[in-house]
């Protein structure tokens, strides 16, 4: 994304609060876990730039996104096609993804089954399993902390959408 929201509790309709999507990836699997489709896209900026602070996190600069990016509306349509074939959407910290995707769908006036599709958050569902100490009991584990707990090692290139969804699928 272009950064983080000013107000994490703001409604998705507060479009100025929610950052812009820069990259998206998804893996569509059948009921037994076999991959049906894998997609990854950089979004071509339209009316916004990618701040250096955000680029430092995910490695996608405004220049790279202009050069390699795809118009957001094309990506939203492909994503909607995948969602329409899905029983569940699974992600790590899905509440953030819901706000970012929801804001982009609203900005582009695109109808989607995204909001009504059942969701599973690997971050929230693995909290008791990972048992990462926090200020008030266990904290929500990062994707890295979940991966370390399950496999005994970290992974490279966190915050690249394809890497993150591939690791989420593995977990």
Task: Name every feature range the model reports, one short phrase each.
Residues 55-78:
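Metal-dependent phosphoesterase signature
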């Amino acid at each position: 994304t272009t950064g983080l929201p000013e107000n994490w509790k703001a409604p998705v309709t507060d479009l100025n609060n929610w950052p812009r999507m820069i990259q998206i990836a998804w893996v569509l699997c059948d009921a037994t876990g076999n991959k049906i489709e894998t997609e990854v896209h950089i979004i071509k900026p339209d009316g916004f730039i990618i701040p250096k602070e955000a680029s430092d996190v995910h490695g996608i600069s405004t220049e790279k996104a202009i050069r390699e990016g795809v118009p957001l509306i094309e990506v939203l349509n492909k994503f909607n096609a995948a969602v329409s074939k899905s029983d569940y959407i699974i992600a790590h910290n899905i509440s953030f993804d819901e706000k970012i995707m929801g804001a982009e769908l609203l900005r582009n006036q695109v109808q989607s089954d995204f909001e009504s599709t059942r969701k599973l958050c690997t971050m929230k569902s693995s909290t008791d399993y990972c048992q990462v100490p926090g200020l008030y009991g266990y904290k929500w584990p990062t994707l890295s902390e979940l991966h370390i707990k399950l496999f005994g090692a970290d992974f490279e290139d966190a915050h690249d959408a394809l890497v993150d969804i591939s690791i989420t699928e593995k977990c």
